[in-house]
């Protein structure tokens, strides 16, 4: 499927990006920006891979591990939930993107709203 092929391309890109990071580190060119990007991309990619596995397994992949019909002993649904937790536990994707923008790219901090102030005139 197209989804699987896109994920395969992302896995290969991450592999080569990791090699580039190792090479930069060993040659003394270490920079925080690539490491921040890898952290964000790895969490999201792991989640997308486990979500694909859950989708491929279908409804039988969601059964409890002790059920007679369960596929893969419930490994992929557990992995999928773990990956969601890693995204949340490591800081939400938006927070990670803000860190990359501020620390890695030197962009100004996102403005904070004053107490009681809303984002727009409709209060959304």
Q: What is each model feature region?
A:
Residues 1-124:
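Alpha-helical interface subdomain recognition
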